[in-house]
Amino acid sequence: HSLRRRQRQMCIRDSLSAEDYTTDMKTHRYPDGAELEFARNMVLHAARAAGIAAFDTVFTNMADPDGFYRETRHIHQLGFDGKSLVNPRQIAMVNSVYEPTKDEVIKAQKVIAAIEEARIKGSGVISMNGQMVDRPVVLRAQRVMSLAKVSNLLDEEGNYIEK
């Protein structure tokens, strides 16, 4: 069990350098990042299959904060757990993409409360606002709440703190 626990604590990242990878592929870095999609998806799928975190590669164009923001939003949408950084000025931007919004936190709280109520009544599946709420939806809601907690977005009672 300790090996399994240790594996879960490890993280996998786009350890092949994006610069090395694009050179090996006989291409180079483009603003839209399309040249990295295959490698990103392979890393992400391998991490998910192993049950460990996945972090994207470094964004090397320090003169393009808008490009960094777009890329960070993209990798968040793909499902990466975070982004590798070499510049501390990028931390706030990554956090702004990954921190749940007030609406996401409120929705997650409602999902968790509703499924708990359903569990008490002996039901495993419910509907909220016309959407089915089952285990995957609950797991996503729990992840939102975990992210909110580690981002210090909740007070002691679990209420969202406005920044």
Predicted regions and their residues:
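Single conserved hydrophobic/aromatic residue that forms the stacking wall/gate
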Residues: 1-12
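Structural preference for beta-strand elements that scaffold enzyme active sites
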Residues: 13, 51-55, 81-82, 125
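Non-cysteine beta-strand/loop elements that form the S-adenosyl-L-methionine
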Residues: 13-21, 43, 82-86
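Glycine-rich tight-turn/loop motif centered on a GG-T
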Residues: 25-36, 98, 102
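Active-site mouth loops of central-metabolism enzymes
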Residues: 29-30, 57-66
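Alpha-helix-loop-beta-strand connector modules within alpha/beta enzyme cores
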Residues: 37-51
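C-terminal alpha-helical cap/extension of soluble enzyme domains
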Residues: 54-55, 62, 95-157, 161-163
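Short, electropositive alpha-helical surface patch
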Residues: 66-81, 138, 142
